[in-house]
Amino acid sequence: MAFKRLLIEFGQGVDMHGGNQNNAILKATQDAVHHCCMAGISEVFEIKDRMTQTKVHADIYVPHPEQADPSVVTNYLDWWPIDAEVHQGGADPRGIAFDGDPETEITIAIVVLTVYVDA
């Protein structure tokens, strides 16, 4: 059988202070996961072995891809076989400095999770 897409889910994560790409990536991944329930994995496709019959691909979009660590996503979703790619994207608007804090960068990451099943 061939792998086919079951789900494409999007998540947004924001690091409000300091522009940390990986904090924003983790929040975006959690956001995407919290928006879906894949009952069809077991009830429709009768998947018994998630590690051989499913896979996940993550597209990670951040303003500074050179600072991004894709293992943030793969470690968080370690109960699935997963691969991840980092792309230029997201947003980094200027934030507000409090009490003279020079770190004013806001980082917004987008994570797109695509779940495939062997169907």
Give the residues covered by each predicted segment.
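C-terminal edge-of-domain segments
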Residues: 82-119
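Short glycine-rich, basic-tinged beta-strand/loop micro-motifs
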Residues: 49-63
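Generic structural hydrophobic/aromatic packing signal, biased to beta-strands
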Residues: 8-10, 56-60, 84, 113
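A glycine-rich helix N-cap at a beta->alpha junction
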Residues: 68-88
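A generic structural signal for short, solvent-exposed coil/turn residues
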Residues: 50, 76-78, 105
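Conserved mixed alpha/beta catalytic, RNA-binding, or beta-rich assembly cores of soluble enzyme
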Residues: 2-48, 65-69, 73, 107-119
